[in-house]
């Protein structure tokens, strides 16, 4: 069984507050994009085997794809094994949810391969135990994501959008980004999720560009001017709008079409470690 595990970008991201349990309430408009990892699942007797290229840098028990397989087996009582072959393209710790999408692909794929029969809702209940972005990928379509990531509401969209996604060479810890945000005395501009959802429903790329907003930029851009320079370069080169995705450091720039994306890509390539022209999935 072969599965494409797609990256996501956040068109809007707002942090509404910190809960007593330490988790943060968020509201985000998220879309999957054509950039993807490739996952191959094969049945095995009992053992769960993970093969990743390039090789995974974390310990096996900490790898999200492996943890997803182990969690599904534990939750369903299944005793079967699997060989998980993962070809990585999405950069790690980049604000594109590369680990989360792989975990969701393992959950949905092994649910079919093993015949465990869980519904999408039941898979999403397992997914939130792996990470806040994982439930979104059970459906992997444009959505409003709320709570700690467990509330996923699909959104109507008129069609695909084109954009350039670029990742500068900036180290990042998502936990640290949240801690910096908690220290803000005053949060600046917040996203208008309603405006973004309306723009997506109309297929209005220019309006999508105007509505892009991520509150994490307020703590990341001052500390990492490379991200700010990349965003400014996208806007100067003609992007309809640009914003950091997730907790960064990746930046997306909305463009009118694929050709404009190719031109923008060449302009900003020197400022990024990785960059792609992508379209959103609907």
UniProtKB/Swiss-Prot annotation:
The record's listing under SUPFAM superfamilies reads: GHMP Kinase, C-terminal domain, Ribosomal protein S5 domain 2-like
Keywords in UniProt for this one?
Answer: ATP-binding, Isoprene biosynthesis, Kinase, Nucleotide-binding, Transferase
Q: In which pathway does it act?
A: Isoprenoid biosynthesis; isopentenyl diphosphate biosynthesis via DXP pathway; isopentenyl diphosphate from 1-deoxy-D-xylulose 5-phosphate: step 3/6
Q: What class of enzyme is it?
A: transferase
Which domain of life does the UniProt lineage start with?
Bacteria
Give the GO terms filed under biological process for this record: isopentenyl diphosphate biosynthetic process, methylerythritol 4-phosphate pathway; terpenoid biosynthetic process
Q: What is its EC number?
A: 2.7.1.148
Residues reported to bind ATP: 91-101
Q: Does the record carry Kinase as a key word? A: yes
Q: Which reaction does it catalyse?
A: 4-CDP-2-C-methyl-D-erythritol + ATP = 4-CDP-2-C-methyl-D-erythritol 2-phosphate + ADP + H(+)
- Kindly give the Gene3D superfamilies that the UniProt entry links to this protein: 3.30.230.10, GHMP kinase, C-terminal domain
| Coiled-coil boundaries | none
Q: Which Pfam families match?
A: GHMP_kinases_C, GHMP_kinases_N
Alphabetical list of InterPro entries matching this protein: GHMP_kinase_C_dom, GHMP_kinase_C_sf, GHMP_kinase_N_dom, IspE, Ribosomal_Su5_D2-typ_SF, Ribsml_uS5_D2-typ_fold_subgr
> Residues in the active site?
8, 133
Q: Give a short account of what the protein does.
A: Catalyzes the phosphorylation of the position 2 hydroxy group of 4-diphosphocytidyl-2C-methyl-D-erythritol.
Family label = Belongs to the GHMP kinase family. IspE subfamily.
Please name the PANTHER family in this protein's record.
4-DIPHOSPHOCYTIDYL-2-C-METHYL-D-ERYTHRITOL KINASE, CHLOROPLASTIC (PTHR43527:SF2)
- Kindly provide the name given to this protein in its UniProt entry: 4-diphosphocytidyl-2-C-methyl-D-erythritol kinase
State the organism named in the record.
Symbiobacterium thermophilum (strain DSM 24528 / JCM 14929 / IAM 14863 / T)
List the lineage, top down.
Bacteria, Bacillati, Bacillota, Clostridia, Eubacteriales
> Its encoding gene is what?
ispE
